[in-house]
Amino acid sequence: MKRRDFLKNSLAASALVSLSCAATAQEHASQKAPVQEYYELRAYRLKSAATEPMLDEFLSKAALPAFNRLGIKPVGVFGEIQPKDPPTVFVLIPYANPAQYAGAVHHVAADPDYLKAGAAYLGTPKSNPVYDRIDSWFMLAFAGMPKIVLPAYSKERKPRLFEMRTYESYSESKALKKVAMFNNGEIDAMHEVGLAPIFYGQALTGPNLPHLTYMTSAENEEAHKKHWDAFGKHPKWDQLKNDPQYADTVSKITKWFLTPKPYSQI
């Protein structure tokens, strides 16, 4: 073999090996990193408490079954433990990717079973609307908890409560730092003390950006308070809250204490 041909063949072989190694590394990386879900969080701002039964009927008989037929589940539906007047109903919908989120609107609207089951709600007259407005946030799950996790009492449909929190930040960079703080140990600490988080989401669209939203759970109020007390004493939390890189990441905290609707899948 001529030296020129030998070098040519050697370079080609090296390139193939490099490509193979890169592909293998990429494959391993994709196997190690679970795909992060996307979430839509809706807040139905009802006209009055009198319209809540119609919304419940629509969600339980029409909307949730339609989502489930598209493989979108579990869908959570919650009311406030101490509802305001008029009340707000929260709906949490998980999506595999943004395309599923965008397509769901059209697929659901063309679903004959959905249209039939939701006819009363969908045909509500202008003179008697069910809600004032629907607020909606589209969120990306955190890398530290890429999918919804259901505790045993949710799966078994036992009595349970949820606390949902939104952490607003004064800048985009500080909002990302707070997400990193969760991913770098805060989520683990919450699991370890029994706070039983359901989801963590970085808001991509919606009101009051930038912010993140997450939900914890417990079997009752006493257990929930006990878990938060334990979290406050956790060494990992003590380390994180005193780390200068995470200073001033949160400018406003909003909390909701929620109870699941009887038909909620969370």
Task: Give the predicted meaning of each segment.
Residues L19-A33, L64-F90, A96, N184-T213, ...:
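Short, glycine- and small/hydrophobic-rich beta-strand elements in well-ordered beta-sheets
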